[in-house]
Amino acid sequence: MAAITAALIKQVREDTGAGMLDVKKALTEAEGDVARAKEIIRAKGIAAAGKREGRKAQEGTIASKVVETANGETGYAVELNSETDFVANGQDFIAMVQEILDQAVENRCKTIDEVKTLKLANGDDAVTAVQQRSGITGEKMEIDGYNFLEGDNLYVYDHMNRHMLATIVRLSESNEDAGHKVAMQVAAMKPIALDEASVPQSVKDEELKVAIEKTKEEQVEKAVVNAIKKAGVNPNLVDSEDHIESNIKKGWLTPEDAEKAREIRAKVGAEKAANLPEQMVQNIAKGRLNKFFKESCLVDQEFQFGDGDKLNVAQWLQAQSKTLAVCDYRRYSLSAE
């Protein structure tokens, strides 16, 4: 059995990142054999990681970069999660996500599955390496996200340099200032699509359905409120059964007026709902849908980083250059939004 010296412990610690006590135990079990000790640490780390599968890893780090390629540029973003920001802010954790990003760039990965099978410097694939690290930190860790964007004139933004929110935008022409500001716009305003045409039809259909229902409810409620007012009852006192009961107890509403309001709500509400002009409902609903597009589509959003002019993103870009436009974007955030 080889002597377990301080130098030997230091070597294994540096190679594995494991704690001193774990290294000493592994070396003792391996009778001083460094290779066996590393394998013991590795196996224990993976086993421990498996026990944490049910736990949530909501903290972490997003590493991102734009690189020059033969065909232009490519922007990459990799997300590695942990359970606490203490682990996520550790040098070893940051080094690991950076290594995964570098390998993704080198291998031009296009999917998260490709990223997970990447071979890292220690010879393990990325998932196995993360599992080993999880065993050392005592926290669940996982590669939870990956994105890339190809094309010329790419700009990446790391919000507040905290590696928790990253965006990549592609412009029609080179403009560093515009690229940075549009990338900040994406971070701040959370667009769901580039433009109206890019919004999935299923989303459009659902938003229109919601807008129609809301419009009908508002029109019916408006008719009911007007009828209750004409009957001499304060509509604010009878807007729900809870309020009616409460206001009767307080003496603010008589039982007779309460019953009158109930009858009006039932009768007028049913009549109005049955006779709503369909075209009017459609017009109002489409107006709501257009508002949704203006708030949710990047090019139509009000630009947040201009000089106070009420311009949308597309208009602001054209004010910088007639041929300047945003062509695509990616947004990645650790938090559920």
Labelled PLM ranges:
Residues A2-E337:
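N-terminal assembly/interaction segments in proteins that build large macromolecular machines
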